[in-house]
A protein has these predicted regions:
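Conserved beta-strand/short-helix segments
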Residues: 1-190
């Protein structure tokens, strides 16, 4: 494609470690910066931009240290391109967020679907087992379609460390999952 996004989680524009994402456009073989984006509610120590993904006119950027209602619960932001301008379209939060979930540690977007990993989430009280959330876009609104977990979840599996989505499929990594050995890790396909 002709667009790329690069995250900079320790960027200090506006304050300490707020983070930023830089969107580049390729024209005639030359890449130039088209925009720098930050969330509308940017704050110190959000670490916005550790994870980024782009699909067509949409960019998703994580801020896994973001504090909204709970310390370090995390948030993800979707930006939309119109012409040469990029604007925030949505802020995604877990429907069941808690402190230190690291929601949005990993993010991906494909067309009208986005996936957000929450590696420290405690599904069913299983500490740091992790979860992932799938969102769907309808016009300019994004809504949670599903929350997914490992069928064999255990404490500290960190399901959601890495996520990807493509068409009707999603893959979620759990780097500390123990099926093949201590912390050997697994990838789950949905």
């Amino acid at each position: 494609g002709n667009y790329a996004v690069v995250g900079s989680r320790y960027n200090d524009t506006g304050g300490t470690d707020r983070g930023a994402a830089f969107i580049f456009h390729k024209s005639g073989g030359t890449w130039t910066e088209q925009a720098m984006v930050q969330p509308s509610d940017t704050a110190n120590d959000d670490w916005f931009g550790r994870g980024v993904a782009i699909s067509g006119d949409y960019v998703i950027v994580n801020a896994y240290a973001k504090t909204t209602n709970n310390t370090g619960q995390g948030a993800a932001y979707i930006f939309y391109r119109s012409g040469t301008s990029w604007a925030q379209q949505a802020k995604l939060n877990a429907s069941d967020s808690e402190a230190s979930d690291a929601y949005s540690y990993s993010v991906d977007i494909d067309g009208d679907y986005a996936i957000v990993g929450s590696l420290n989430e405690d599904p069913g009280g299983t500490s740091n087992a992790g979860s992932a959330y799938i969102y769907v876009r309808s016009e300019t609104s994004w809504s949670q379609q599903a929350k997914i977990q490992a069928s064999d979840k255990e404490a500290n599996d960190t399901f959601g460390r890495g996520v990807t989505i493509s068409g009707d499929y999603a893959a979620v990594g759990a780097d500390n999952e123990d099926t093949s050995g201590s912390n050997a890790g697994s990838v789950y396909i949905f």
